Amino acid sequence: SEAMLSTARSVIRTCLQVRREEDVLVITDPETAEVGQSLYEEAARVTDRILLVMMPPTQKPGKEPPLPVADIMRKNRVIIIATKDSLTHTRARQQATKEGARIVSMPGIGRISFETGGMTADYNALQREISGMGSVFRRKRRVRVSSPSGTEIEFLTGGRWVLEDNGICNRPGQIANLPAGKVFVFPKEGSMNGTIVIDGSWEGILLEEPLSLNIEKGMVVNIS
């Protein structure tokens, strides 16, 4: 569909900024083949050095891909992983990163999630917004988070590093999960106190009722 091709265009041209002379590898499986095809078509508009590989489902996140797939991953500069289960935390992905590939991973991506929601973001605008949020975190040491559903926590950052997940993956060795749009910071050990309420989903499963985690000095002391 045009909506899928539009999202694929954003991934190829904005997130990865693929260049004409680059080798591009798209990895997909039977459950995500439609997404893989649209990514292939848009990449082919930029470069003719494009390969689409369909592999069997790995059945669980983190399981190594077949050896031929791992081998070919090491030989490409740009890799797009659109598979049901994540390959992010595999030796094959780590080796490809070490060889200088830049990688975008979209575990569990399907037609609906590819056409709508976070995948349709303006990633150039998102990069500017995330950068602004990241600079705020770097200047602050005490963080308080609250929500209408009942989350109320405080913690210290302790001057930890801040990771900006903005979806732009244009340098060798970079890896990004899409859709993006997060700022990460580790709390200082023992500094977090309060309650976190999760009222949406947990590990990809919609919750029937909210999940509350009570935290004291950085440790979860009660779950209800």
Model-derived features with residue positions:
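Dual-mode signal for accessory low-complexity, basic/Gly-rich regions
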Residues: 206, 222-224
